[in-house]
């Protein structure tokens, strides 16, 4: 049978999602816990491979197993064998046609900026700290040029392995909640470091270092070297993955929990 899981994790203690031989990873910890509960080796497929230090409240994974367990047994059993910074939010048996990555029609990320003169003591691994007066409204205006299917070469990592630089951005919103600035962006898929590279350039506009038209200029240039530095990983969350209605996957609050939805 095929099982889908919704998971959340604090990525600050891991070298990213993907299993690696020499370092700790979210995938490695989940596969270990699932293999204990299933009493057989389990291999996982995920909706989006997050980088080192990046978090998730809405990651979706799937695996195949011969083990017969009810949803409660999977959830409680796996959580009991996971570190405290990874948790299963829901479990659902799915059709064999479901694939966590290839069935997904959209991914959504939130980047949380703590905009204050002094660094945070609490949530220091859950937000990215930037001082200076950030104009969230300008960032939002500038970001609207990113909508639609476009060539995002200027915002892809040098090591990106995607065969095409084209992605379709469905929505992008920048809002302020007190000391926090939140960049919320959804697309059919993302290039390596695409969200953090977009945020890095939007911050230059929000801080007044670049004009509102700069994002459009960068898109036209198709040159990563012309854009701003990659934003820090700590404030980034994979908050949602969209699938066709036929799979009837649970929908929970997006998070992160310390932000208002």
Curated annotation (Swiss-Prot):
Coiled coil: none
Catalytic residues identified in the record: 51 (nucleophile)
CDD domains for the chain: PseudoU_synth_EcTruA
Pfam family name, one: PseudoU_synth_1
Source taxon at top rank: Bacteria
Protein task: Formation of pseudouridine at positions 38, 39 and 40 in the anticodon stem and loop of transfer RNAs.
Binding positions (substrate): 109
Keyword Chaperone: no
UniProt xrefs under NCBIfam families: hisT_truA (TIGR00071)
Alphabetical keyword list: Isomerase, tRNA processing
A Gene Ontology molecular function term of the record: RNA binding
Gene Ontology BP annotations: tRNA pseudouridine synthesis
UniProt protein name: tRNA pseudouridine synthase A
Reactions the enzyme catalyzes: uridine(38/39/40) in tRNA = pseudouridine(38/39/40) in tRNA
């Amino acid at each position: 049978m095929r099982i889908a899981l919704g998971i959340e994790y604090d990525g600050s203690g891991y070298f990213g999602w993907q299993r690696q031989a020499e370092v700790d990873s979210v995938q490695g910890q989940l596969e270990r816990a699932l293999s204990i509960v299933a009493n057989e080796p389990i291999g996982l497929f995920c909706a989006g491979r997050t980088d080192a230090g990046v978090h998730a409240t809405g990651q979706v994974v799937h695996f195949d197993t011969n083990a017969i367990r009810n949803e409660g047994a999977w959830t409680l059993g796996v959580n009991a064998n996971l570190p405290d910074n990874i948790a299963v939010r829901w479990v659902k048996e799915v059709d064999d046609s479901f694939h966590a990555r290839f069935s997904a029609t959209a991914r959504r990320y939130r980047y949380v900026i703590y905009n204050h003169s002094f660094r945070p003591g609490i949530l220091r691994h859950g937000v990215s700290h930037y001082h200076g007066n950030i104009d969230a409204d300008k960032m939002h205006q500038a970001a609207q040029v990113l909508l639609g299917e476009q060539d995002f070469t200027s915002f892809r990592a040098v090591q990106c392995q995607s065969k095409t630089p084209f992605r379709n951005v469905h929505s992008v919103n920048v809002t302020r909640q007190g000391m926090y600035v939140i960049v919320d962006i959804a697309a059919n898929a993302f290039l390596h470091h695409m969200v953090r590279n977009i945020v890095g350039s939007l911050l230059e506009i929000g801080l007044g270092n670049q004009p509102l038209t700069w994002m459009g200029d960068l898109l036209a240039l198709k040159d990563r070297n012309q854009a701003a530095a990659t934003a820090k990983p700590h404030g980034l969350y994979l908050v949602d993955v969209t699938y066709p209605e036929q799979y009837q996957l649970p929908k929970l609050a997006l998070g992160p929990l310390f932000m208002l939805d």
